[in-house]
Amino acid sequence: MMAARMMAAGLAATALSAHAFRIPTPGEQDARIQTVPYHPEEVVLVRAWNGYVTRIVFDEQEKIIDVAAGFADGWQFSPEGNVLYIKAKSFPAQGSPAQAPEPGLWNTNLLVKTDRRLYDFDLVLASADAATPQALQRSRMAYRLQFRYPAAPQAASRASPVGPAVPAGALNRRYAMQVGNGSDGIAPIAAYDDGRHTWLTFRPGQPFPAVFAVAPDGTETLVNLHIDNQSLVIHRVAPVLMLRSGASVIRIVNQNGDASESPAFECHAEPAL
């Protein structure tokens, strides 16, 4: 069992070195405080040392909802709100002493899902015994890894929910809403798209729900988005969106209509979810 794990870990380490990933930038005051720009299509490198804790800090408006790793038995993950604490731990081997964390063999991938975004990491257990300054730089661990997010586009007017820089007539506003029992608290007051992005606008002070795109087979996938004033700007246009917050659920349907022939938002009195 242990030998198989060591062989698999060795192969994983080889595969890790063969792929590109985003390396965080060390801080000017302390290299262990690292920053990386967020991009939904990039894998980020996280370097840890045995006996130390690393924390990954996501956007303050995010909440971690799921964490998965390829070698979960060798790592401890503790999510708290928008912060994920990571620490290497011994591998429990049957019939033999537990294997202590070993640099290289503990390398794995880490996937994090929040209520706003998806994140992908290469998680590396680096060695503190670097023979050269270059090797030390490559093994530089992170006490804190934080993301820098792209600025949300400025709305043309705070009084208007329309954010896209396209003529109003080019917007598709034909959206219908199906509200679950007791779910009015997460219902948007407007929905529209410009063919590339979808806007869901909410009342001031209203909490934002998690947003999922629904596939034809019913599978739900968390979407990437950013916040623009009182709107969630979803980085895609989908036939069906599902909004969720606790037990509250709302279904948003894109009716693909001509904006000039439809009201701003159709709130249908459909059967509850």
Curated annotation (Swiss-Prot):
<feature type="signal peptide">
    <location>
        <begin position="1"/>
        <end position="20"/>
    </location>
</feature>
<protein>
    <recommendedName>
        <fullName>Type IV secretion system protein PtlF</fullName>
    </recommendedName>
</protein>
<comment type="subunit">
    <text>Forms a complex with PtlI.</text>
</comment>
<keyword id="KW-0813">Transport</keyword>
<dbReference type="GO" id="GO:0009279">
    <property type="term" value="C:cell outer membrane"/>
</dbReference>
<comment type="similarity">
    <text>Belongs to the TrbG/VirB9 family.</text>
</comment>
<dbReference type="InterPro" id="IPR038161">
    <property type="entry name" value="VirB9/CagX/TrbG_C_sf"/>
</dbReference>
<comment type="function">
    <text>Component of the type IV secretion system ptl required for secretion of assembled pertussis toxin (PTX) through the outer membrane.</text>
</comment>
<keyword id="KW-0998">Cell outer membrane</keyword>
<dbReference type="Pfam" id="PF03524">
    <property type="entry name" value="CagX"/>
</dbReference>
<dbReference type="InterPro" id="IPR010258">
    <property type="entry name" value="Conjugal_tfr_TrbG/VirB9/CagX"/>
</dbReference>
<keyword id="KW-0732">Signal</keyword>
<dbReference type="InterPro" id="IPR033645">
    <property type="entry name" value="VirB9/CagX/TrbG_C"/>
</dbReference>
<dbReference type="InterPro" id="IPR014148">
    <property type="entry name" value="VirB9"/>
</dbReference>
<keyword id="KW-0472">Membrane</keyword>
